Amino acid sequence: NSLISDKTALSAAPADTDEFLISDAGTLKRIDYSLIKATNTPMILAVSNTSQTVSDSTTTKVTSLNTQPINTGGTWDSSNHRWTPGVAGTYFLAGQTSININNAGSYLQAMVYKNGSVISYNQVTAEGTNATYISQACIIDTADTDDYYELYIRHNTGGNSTINYDTAYKYTNFFGYKLT
């Protein structure tokens, strides 16, 4: 006769204090769900929601990331446009930039900075003209409690360019979350 049936099945995620039985070399032990569940916080998604002009051949901080649809733990500094996780750990971080490029051979770069220095970089080169281009940079990085991260952009289109933004499609964005 089984103690487990469809009448005892969980219909939602377990509570942190729910317990599981495990076998440790043949000895049954209890463990709370809170000790084994995945937690990817702190986490951030910052999205560009306004126009920002970027000068030709100039590395520029993206300061138009004014919407944070996800911001759990950590600190988004809207005056400095940077994220401080606030919890030591290993993080996945990524940034995406988008502009229109009118000249074949021009490039667009996305860069993730840590504490004022670039740690991840990606470049796309335009193959055609009059098209929207997106560059994405990502990295797994170890942070302490006061490290901070920022998104930068650079292009060489021959003149000023405006960052593409749309809060629905999130053309230009920065995100990060704790892995361990």
Question: Where does each model-flagged region fall?
Answer:
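Extracellular jelly-roll beta-sandwich "head" domains, especially the C-terminal globular C1q domain
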Residues: A38-T180
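Short, surface-exposed terminal/edge motifs of secreted or surface/virion proteins that either
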Residues: I22-T39
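Short, surface-exposed beta-edge/turn micro-motifs
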Residues: A15-E19, A88-T90
